[in-house]
Amino acid sequence: MRFLYDVVGCGMWAYSHAAFRVETLGPRRFRLEPSTMIVVTHRRETDVPVIGPILYVGARLWRNVGDRMAFAARDDMFVRGFFAGFTEELSPSVRRLLYRVGVGPGLPLVHVHPIGSARLALVKQVLEEEPAAPLGDSLSDELVGELKARAAAAGLPAPSRASDVLRGEYADVLFRPVSRGEVATRRADELWARRAGNAAREFRFLVELVRAGRSLLVFPEGRPSPDGEIGPLRRGVDALVRRARPRSVLPLSIAYDPLVRGRTRVVVSVGAFQPPPAENIEGAILALLRSSLPLTGGQVVAAQLVSGQTPSAADLAGAVEQARETGRPIDPALADAGGRARRLDEALAIAEERRDELPYLAREYESARAG
């Protein structure tokens, strides 16, 4: 539905600019070439509403309707209750409310399509195979213990059967991916056969989209980085590139810098269209994501603090010089000595109250430099 695509594009623009201070590097206007695969670093769950408007406005997709890209999204977004498990910070009452909400049927209307895994399933999907079965017959002792601890903390009766935990209070655990070795349901063969069949169909659909000339946005890492590392890539990225045969690859990279006053600063680099790699596809895509991640002041300051050193203007200047030599995008706030001094003072002033963010930023900095 054309109108719905426009509404979502405008809504994401409004959200991203209210929640963040967004800085875009690279071309502000461009045309999405047919059969382009847009590869994006996955930093946070908010990545899509940050980059969506940049592509929507930059490629003028309200006008160039035929150029509208499709999105490959992890398949748990299509499961009812996804938003209840979206973040650990939600209260039990909010989880209960969101657990009833399902957006899966509407996602294809805005060109969002699932890409699943044959090797992973959600705890929720495992338990729904046999709702009346004892928890221990379906899940590992560790997961059962975690669910019982959650019940005790929430003042709920101790769960004994699968159906006891298929409710919103447990959503963040229910939407956790598990492998075959972590589950013990008697219907495991049926579950994993169905997962494999769905994953194969979803993969073929995405391949045909690109072959037919559509642009496709993918997050090669699959999920947001838990620790700041860029990579590893999810299984199947190389097969998707080989089978879909995109005409070009367009890298987008996102760097969040929370070591600022007020709203988090987000720097997004829009790269250049380039031919898809013919060899060592996963390695080439990973190197592309790392080398295109913007350098921020928060990364440099965090790396120094985590290593037990005191950040200095010289550290920032050295990082900027190295980024320039390697062609890595740089936050414009670091362009000159005055800007670097201001960012250094600001980051140091805010670092103590956001110390939990420091290891992530430091790891991101080192990972990007690894190339």
Feature map (PLM): residue ranges:
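Membrane-interfacial amphipathic helices and adjacent loop/beta segments
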Residues: 1-27, 42, 46-207, 265
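A short beta-turn/loop motif at secondary-structure boundaries
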Residues: 27-31, 258-261
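Residues that form or flank phosphate/diphosphate-binding pockets in enzymes
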Residues: 33, 46-49, 228
